[in-house]
């Protein structure tokens, strides 16, 4: 599940999951639903990548910006993600498989361009019923 919250010139995303991995997955869905209707994205292509972060905030920032890199460079949009997060001596490592397809302007109904994810007001916290993340994107 994901929701949006308003900020002054940007857009905030709030995502929840029963696990940290599920919250990151929902956060990525929220990112792509800003850009396109993710229900219209088919799983024709997949990409796999691995990123690290010294803390969870850096991990989330690196994860979402890595996805944006694939959108900017490869013209891909995604609607599903397999996410695995491991804690290690240097912080955290995330492995992701993202599923989607090339952008098709007629099919995907382009809504907004997301320029970047920011650290501004980023939150990641464990709650009684799971995890919640919040982040803001520059449009």
Swiss-Prot record:
One of its GO terms (biological process) is tRNA splicing, via endonucleolytic cleavage and ligation. One of its GO terms (molecular function) is calcium ion binding. Ca(2+) binds at residues 10, 138-139. The keyword Metal-binding applies. Keywords: Calcium, Metal-binding, tRNA processing. Belongs to the archease family. Activates the tRNA-splicing ligase complex by facilitating the enzymatic turnover of catalytic subunit RtcB. Acts by promoting the guanylylation of RtcB, a key intermediate step in tRNA ligation. Can also alter the NTP specificity of RtcB such that ATP, dGTP or ITP is used efficiently. This is Protein archease. It comes from Methanocaldococcus jannaschii (strain ATCC 43067 / DSM 2661 / JAL-1 / JCM 10045 / NBRC 100440).
């Amino acid at each position: 599940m994901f929701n949006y919250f308003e900020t002054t010139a940007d857009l905030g995303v709030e995502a929840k999951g029963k696990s940290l991995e599920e919250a990151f997955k929902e956060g990525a869905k929220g990112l792509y639903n800003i850009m396109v209707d993710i229900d219209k994205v088919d799983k024709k292509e997949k990409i796999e990548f691995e990123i690290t972060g010294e803390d969870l905030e850096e991990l989330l920032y690196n994860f979402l910006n890595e996805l944006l890199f694939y959108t900017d460079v490869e013209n891909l949009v995604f609607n599903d993600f397999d996410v695995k997060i491991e804690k290690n001596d240097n912080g955290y490592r995330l492995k992701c498989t993202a599923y989607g397809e090339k952008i098709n302007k007629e099919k995907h109904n382009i809504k907004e361009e997301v320029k970047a994810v920011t650290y501004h007001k980023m939150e990641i916290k464990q709650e009684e019923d799971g995890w919640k993340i919040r982040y803001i994107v520059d449009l």
